[in-house]
Amino acid sequence: ATRFAVEAYVNFVREKTLVEAVASSLTELFAPKIHKERISGMLENYDFISDDVMQYFKRRLTQAPDDAAFALDYVKRNARTPEAQAAVLDALRFKTNVLWVQLDALYHAYYDPGLIPPGAFVPGGADG
């Protein structure tokens, strides 16, 4: 389900207008707080997670605010019509739905009921 959600997002960005694609990245407005929580939570709770593994999220603590500021400015300057503004809101809703689907898939695979799909990461398994 996570792969499907990511592919749906890539297709969305490919097929929509530039302003819609940029608008879908506005979830980055909230990323630093979320990444900070993820970093500490994952390091505390998962022995297979190391500081090195978390480098992507650590970089996002400073990169995400710049990316979000750029995206917000771009959307404000380019979504001038009511139709374009509605499309921007739809793009952001789509992206949040993609993120929820990913979270639901991870919950289903690794928590309850714990059905890890074939080919996925298995904690403590041959790949983990």
What residue ranges belong to the model's regions?
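Non-heme di-metal
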Residues: A1-G128
